[in-house]
Amino acid sequence: MSLSCGDLANHNDRVVSLLNVCRKAPSFARTKALHALSITLCSVLLQPVYVCNNIISLYEKLGEVSLAGKVFDQMPERNKVSFNTIIKGYSKYGDVDKAWGVFSEMRYFGYLPNQSTVSGLLSCASLDVRAGTQLHGLSLKYGLFMADAFVGTCLLCLYGRLDLLEMAEQVFEDMPFKSLETWNHMMSLLGHRGFLKECMFFFRELVRMGASLTESSFLGVLKGVSCVKDLDISKQLHCSATKKGLDCEISVVNSLISAYGKCGNTHMAERMFQDAGSWDIVSWNAIICATAKSENPLKALKLFVSMPEHGFSPNQGTYVSVLGVSSLVQLLSCGRQIHGMLIKNGCETGIVLGNALIDFYAKCGNLEDSRLCFDYIRDKNIVCWNALLSGYANKDGPICLSLFLQMLQMGFRPTEYTFSTALKSCCVTELQQLHSVIVRMGYEDNDYVLSSLMRSYAKNQLMNDALLLLDWASGPTSVVPLNIVAGIYSRRGQYHESVKLISTLEQPDTVSWNIAIAACSRSDYHEEVIELFKHMLQSNIRPDKYTFVSILSLCSKLCDLTLGSSIHGLITKTDFSCADTFVCNVLIDMYGKCGSIRSVMKVFEETREKNLITWTALISCLGIHGYGQEALEKFKETLSLGFKPDRVSFISILTACRHGGMVKEGMGLFQKMKDYGVEPEMDHYRCAVDLLARNGYLKEAEHLIREMPFPADAPVWRTFLDGCNRFAEEQRNTLNVVSFQ
């Protein structure tokens, strides 16, 4: 029984209706069944174009591009929709050759490309510059670029993907119409490359124009903040997102957590995480990554352990972050457990995870396991080699260089990081060989490699050769190598030369000023240090924590409380005061040496993340000012919080006991040092001898000296004799009083 034309059309319409239903919940089995039904109703040669187009579209949506291609190839006739649909499919899944072939065929049959054609081709991830510029020209020729913002936005994304930022900016400027999506893509492009200033310019323009900002508007800028680590702008964007009601959107929350973490404000990152109404795996990865970079990286491991309680399973990004934490604190057993979890859960150890494992074992000093992980990876890339080389560079220089040569023989081209790593472990002969390889491969003018070469020559006591490298550089030398030279001068004690070189820089950066300030500080040019710091502020160069540490160290040396308090006020304005533990520790030390215990306690209480150094600095300050009992209580509190005291912690508490006359407590702690894995050194014995001698326990002090595992030095004997003299003087004074009575 044959179907009439009307019946056939009705059946085809029903097939298309069913295909549209299937599109809402795509299923390969249902699509194939409908495809078979359409062939049954009428042969392949009689299938209408609109039916075939729908089948191609659904196969493309399911990722079955080869089947979509077969349907396209068998079509008796095609229209522009047919060509655009299959071009989109091939482009989406990276088959640029087939996409371009269909595009050429389309033009051959006289079909002019439209926006859908060009945007489909531009979305292909593997499209090269030549093809991209050709499409750019065609879009201008056929008026597609000028029609609306869609094609221009696609071109902008393509140039961004190809890292052609200037071309992307030119496209943006030439576009007659710009959609919000265009602006968002441009900001994202700039943000991901760390151009925060330019990114913020576009963001402020959008705000000025009264545009309705979306999540994407914030994401690109926040990425730029993360790259540049600008805390002030992070806060501004946070406020702006709150005003727009976007601060609860999970993607914005995740980006803010990441930005605060990268800027070193772990407190705000944790607060954002806790205040979020809901989390996803990206939220967990962001907070783990943020806390991993904090003063207490073990928090990241605790968060990792708590993930299953909240219904989340770690993914590749999570494992990479926690392996980084394990390597940072050198917890070999913890990292091994994570490695075991990966194997148990059947996680495939690809390039990213493999590199993380290589790096973890290398940083923990287990080069054997690091090499095993390296050998296990099938398709190695240069990152794998860099991770392995970095491990051997810190432990075994000759093997590191042997691996470097092996890498070259296997055809891998070194990056600037590869050279920098290999240069760490060079002796003079190997350094000269590597230098020749660097020149041969054209890296001699690379600032990063040039700086590493200078450090290596300086490390091998070849200072003049290090300085000559600047003269040999063919291109204009940036501030980075010049900073290295200034640093070399400073370490050699040539402070005048260091400051003189910095003063010749047209645009010295924060590091330049820090080197000059540190150089003057080391040579005790106190007034010059203050003048340099003032000049730095007048030049609108933002001080960092190292600048403040240098100035605060000078305040400690001079016991200048007024200057120290002024610097503290400036630190508070730049938001370093509570967020940065390193700065807080130096502030505690400065106030302690200047005799302001009240300020010491205030800074200590305001410090958000206290580490062992924070507690040790407080104990030291309390001890030297006679608050022995309070120092002892703080030491006990340190232990109760899980901190493991080190050699400096014990010197601080023994000094506190010595000043407070607490012989029993002090000697009890001295005897327990080994329980905490700390072997008493000469400084500890000196404190213990002084504690005993100055309190009249001369026999015990002498016995302790005789029992020392190494010969006592002159200061130990001097301490003992001072105690003897003091005790003898006290006895004479007592006898005189008795005689007088």
Swiss-Prot record:
Signal peptide from the UniProt entry: none
One Pfam family this sequence matches: PPR
Record field: transmembrane: none
GO biological process, one term: RNA modification
PPR repeats: 48-78, 79-113, 114-146, 148-178, 179-213, 214-248, 249-279, 280-314, 315-349, 350-380, 381-414, 415-445, 446-481, 483-508, 509-543, 544-578, 580-610, 611-645, 646-680, 681-715
Keywords: Repeat
Protein name: Pentatricopeptide repeat-containing protein At3g58590
Originating organism: Arabidopsis thaliana (Mouse-ear cress)
